[in-house]
């Protein structure tokens, strides 16, 4: 009984303390794409003209489009699920990881809010959905992971990325 009271007390403190939080792991995320875009307002005002990395949105910097998978443990074996696309990009002098991350996130926010036009087959924006964009450094350059939780949206992201950069190499098989 004592243990139950301790757990219920801890749970009530955690839930009451996070009533105003925008994210709590035990509750579903109810934010809309517009809500998420507005969360970036302060960050994106500094780069309103997109001058930090003007070539970041060019299809020519994308060397390959690789389908991004996640391993989900289910039962004995597990399962691979499509999450989106990994866009491998050429390194350029004016495009470090942080600048590229902010440029792509602000582009998604601006298009979502109607402040910027959507590029043809834009892999960084999907109407009605918010894409998780994470830029990292690799041995060969930069990689922008454009991810979503919906399998249908993930498939659309891969298709749009391939059409956006048709000269880029397409890799669909999961990597070990």
Question: Where do the PLM segments sit?
Answer:
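Terminal, regulation- and interaction-focused segments at domain boundaries
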Residues: 35-37, 74-97, 145
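Mature extracytoplasmic domains of secretory-pathway proteins
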Residues: 88-122
């Amino acid at each position: 009984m004592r243990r139950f009271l301790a757990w219920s007390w801890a749970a009530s403190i955690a839930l009451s303390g996070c009533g105003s939080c925008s994210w709590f792991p035990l509750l579903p995320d109810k934010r809309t794409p517009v809500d998420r875009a507005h969360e970036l307002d302060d960050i994106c005002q500094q780069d309103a003209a997109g001058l930090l990395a003007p070539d970041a949105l060019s299809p020519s910097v994308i060397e390959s489009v690789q389908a991004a998978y996640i391993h989900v443990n289910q039962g004995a074996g597990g399962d691979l699920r499509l999450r989106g696309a990994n866009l491998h990009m050429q390194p350029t002098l004016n495009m470090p990881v942080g600048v590229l991350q902010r440029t792509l996130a602000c582009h998604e926010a601006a298009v979502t809010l109607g402040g910027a036009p959507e590029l043809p087959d834009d892999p960084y924006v999907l109407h009605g959905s918010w894409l998780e964009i994470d830029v990292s450094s690799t041995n060969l350059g930069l990689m922008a992971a454009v991810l979503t939780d919906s399998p249908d949206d993930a498939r659309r992201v891969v298709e749009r990325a391939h059409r956006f950069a048709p000269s880029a190499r397409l890799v669909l098989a999961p990597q070990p």
